[in-house]
């Protein structure tokens, strides 16, 4: 089998295509959630906390000197990214929960004979 043909079969396998679609949709979903958090949730949260803009929250570690910019710890952006993560994780949890609910439960394998029944059968065979 040629290398190209083998790669084509691999790339067109259902799992790879499904994963590619998931990555693309996940990227788009991430942008939507980032916009939701940055443009809707954080401004409302800022108003509730007295007009704080979380994007501007930072701790200056070293002041700017001449042409060198200040060294800052931007914890406001970190808080915003934590909100992004929580919303995305919760949405994924809900989707997986819904998918698992839709999946049909796997049929149980038929139960075989018990250990006692097998031992009795072996005993009977040895008696013959």
Curated annotation (Swiss-Prot):
Annotated S-S bridges: none
Bilayer-crossing regions: 10-30, 76-96
Pfam families: MscL
Domain of life: Bacteria
GO molecular function terms noted in the UniProt entry: mechanosensitive monoatomic ion channel activity
Subunit architecture: Homopentamer.
Organism: Actinobacillus succinogenes (strain ATCC 55618 / DSM 22257 / CCUG 43843 / 130Z)
Name of this protein: Large-conductance mechanosensitive channel
Main location: membrane
Compartment(s) where it occurs, according to its Swiss-Prot or TrEMBL record: Cell inner membrane
Its job: Channel that opens in response to stretch forces in the membrane lipid bilayer. May participate in the regulation of osmotic pressure changes within the cell.
UniProtKB keywords: Cell inner membrane, Cell membrane, Ion channel, Ion transport, Membrane, Transmembrane, Transmembrane helix, Transport
A single GO cellular-component term on record: plasma membrane
Family that this chain belongs to: Belongs to the MscL family.
